[in-house]
């Protein structure tokens, strides 16, 4: 059993008492750090960085050297699974992801292999093992995956999209084909996340970045149903610890009750949700993570501290809150801002845990 020097993040996810509110940042290993840019340049390109365990470890640890963060998150990408399925992933300079072979018919779905996490995705597991070794038990390591719906949007659209016309066309005209794809992706995600847990991650998160573009019934049917399947299939205890599961649907504030009923341990919230209202709705069932607008980090230190204090007050007394941004940190925020943010969370949250 690994004894963590700081297990505040895991305790908060399980709604157990903590001394202060834990904090980490989505995309905390990333382009806002000059040392990240240098390491990525050394790797050559983004996927080469992901595939090199030592360099992926280095960028995972970089933000922890600068800021007093309560968790590390594996440096990887949500599109590793479709890439391992053979869709030909590439990232152009200054562009989003593109797939050379998008999915557009039933036989394409049927022919998709489910990747073996210790074969096609072994580079991810090697990174997990390397990071765990180098963390030396300082803080927990978070593993993650994209949700089936979100992965499917990229696979069907062939890359990023604003209108999601191709996948919505499939959803309304060929729903059986889309369900077949989503079911296969859910199976792949379960294998992938369980392999990450066996390799050493101590909590997992499912990112449903594009669930918020769906209508109410469609969200339940095409996104949440498959996240529920994933939650049911995950290893929930490892190395003497519970392995908490967080679900995050960007734009998912309407569906918190349904999300909380999946059996997950926590919900990620974006900044459109009032934390006090979210706590009243589902705080008796799950912990909450979030939810400061990442753009607040463009503001003055005093304004950042004010926003942190407001969000802490919204959640109020007790455990069950992991402070985070409502989405990933922007790459051009002032260098001082993340430190002001992280330190403010710790400083001002002690009052709420006495």
Swiss-Prot record:
GO terms for cellular component: cytosol. Gene3D superfamilies: 3.20.20.210. Its EC number is 4.1.1.37. Its main location: cytoplasm. It catalyses: uroporphyrinogen III + 4 H(+) = coproporphyrinogen III + 4 CO2. It is found in: Cytoplasm. GO terms for molecular function: uroporphyrinogen decarboxylase activity. The record marks 77 as: Transition state stabilizer. One of its GO terms (biological process) is protoporphyrinogen IX biosynthetic process from glutamate. Substrate binds at residues 27-31, 77, 154, 209, 327. Keywords: Cytoplasm, Decarboxylase, Lyase, Porphyrin biosynthesis. Pfam families: URO-D. Transmembrane segments: none annotated. Coiled coil: none annotated. The keyword Lipoprotein does not apply. Pathway: Porphyrin-containing compound metabolism; protoporphyrin-IX biosynthesis; coproporphyrinogen-III from 5-aminolevulinate: step 4/4. The keyword NADP does not apply. Catalyzes the decarboxylation of four acetate groups of uroporphyrinogen-III to yield coproporphyrinogen-III. Homodimer. PANTHER family: METHYLTETRAHYDROFOLATE:HOMOCYSTEINE METHYLTRANSFERASE RELATED (PTHR21091), UROPORPHYRINOGEN DECARBOXYLASE (PTHR21091:SF169). Belongs to the uroporphyrinogen decarboxylase family. NCBIfam families: hemE. This is Uroporphyrinogen decarboxylase.
